[in-house]
Amino acid sequence: MSLTYMNMFMAFTISLLGLLMYRSHMMSSLLCLEGMMLSLFVMMTMVILNTHLTLASMIPIILLVFAACEAALGLSLLVMVSTTYGMDYVQNLNLLQC
């Protein structure tokens, strides 16, 4: 495994650990999700370029489209929760606490 692949795997792992550990604020969760999507995009692009898979060359673009949709939905949810409750805690999304 080359050093570049190992760096991308470590970036994904650190983002996943950040998502699991710092779950209190929604903004930090969204940033960790974006880090995971970015590392997946770079890893997928490197694999496709190294293996010369021309049929799979659209997959990273599709992943970027899903990442943009996820970011837009996450930010709109963040704005809605912060205007409704006045804070961006993830625990405000739990409907069982109401």
UniProtKB/Swiss-Prot annotation:
UniProt keyword annotation of Transferase present: no
Residues passing through the membrane, by range: 1-21, 29-49, 61-81
Major location category of this protein: mitochondrion
Subcellular location: Mitochondrion inner membrane
Catalytic activity: a ubiquinone + NADH + 5 H(+)(in) = a ubiquinol + NAD(+) + 4 H(+)(out)
Any GO MF annotation of the entry: NADH dehydrogenase (ubiquinone) activity
Entry keyword set: Electron transport, Membrane, Mitochondrion, Mitochondrion inner membrane, NAD, Respiratory chain, Translocase, Transmembrane, Transmembrane helix, Transport, Ubiquinone
GO biological process, one term: ATP synthesis coupled electron transport
Gene Ontology terms: cellular component: mitochondrial inner membrane; respiratory chain complex I
Domain of life of the native organism: Eukaryota
Protein EC: 7.1.1.2
Membrane topology: Multi-pass membrane protein
UniProt subunit comment: Core subunit of respiratory chain NADH dehydrogenase (Complex I) which is composed of 45 different subunits.
UniProt record similarity statement: Belongs to the complex I subunit 4L family.
Annotated function: Core subunit of the mitochondrial membrane respiratory chain NADH dehydrogenase (Complex I) which catalyzes electron transfer from NADH through the respiratory chain, using ubiquinone as an electron acceptor. Part of the enzyme membrane arm which is embedded in the lipid bilayer and involved in proton translocation.
The protein's name in its UniProt record: NADH-ubiquinone oxidoreductase chain 4L
